[in-house]
Amino acid sequence: IEICAVLAFSAIQNGDKVGLVLFSDVVEKVVPPKKGKKHVLRIIRELYTIKATGKGTSISTAMNYVNRLLNRRSIVVLASDFQDTEYDTALKITNQKHDLVNLSIRHPFEEELPDLGLLSLYNAETNEQVMVDSSNKRLRAHLQSKLKEKHDAFDKHMVKLQMDNIVVHTDKSYIRPLMSFFQRRLSRY
């Protein structure tokens, strides 16, 4: 939420409009683009108070909605953990119509599962629950390796699609990744 607020305030300082589309497997909430501090505060309030009704994630649904909503070329920031599939076409279309910036949110447990003993893990996307013995070193190493492969493949795929991708970790400051992104953009233009 904080990084979205920073980006929104930065945009209004630049005189730009800011909007919000919150989604799960459906579009949950839309705040149409407007200018002004009061509008950004409304967006922040919506981010804090949203109660999602959907169970999964459909990036395609959200991007298709954004493409219908925005008539003019805009900067679109997609903040997600990208635990979805089948979104390439929607991202490509959005990237062609707009300036798409993917903000990949990653949790420390996705980097390294801690030794916490027996865990009951619930996947809200698939509605599945599994028991995992996190004190098993081989299992932790295997899971860590698979997650690293998945993240590396995603990052390479974004490069292949020529899309901007900012990786932000929930347990670390977002300042460095944002600054690095803006410096790369400045050197490009």
Predicted region positions:
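Charge-dense, low-complexity intrinsically disordered segments
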Residues: 34, 53, 141, 145
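Von Willebrand factor
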Residues: 39-74, 86, 107
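Von Willebrand factor type A / integrin I
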Residues: 65-75, 84-189
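RNase H catalytic domain
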Residues: 23-41, 45-49
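A conditional alpha-helix N-cap/helix-loop micro-motif detector
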Residues: 1, 55-59, 147
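Short hydrophobic/aromatic-rich motifs at helix boundaries and adjacent loops
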Residues: 15-18, 34-36, 61-62, 126-128, ...
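An amphipathic, basic-hydrophobic helix/alpha-beta surface used to engage anionic
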Residues: 1-33, 65, 75-78, 84-85, ...
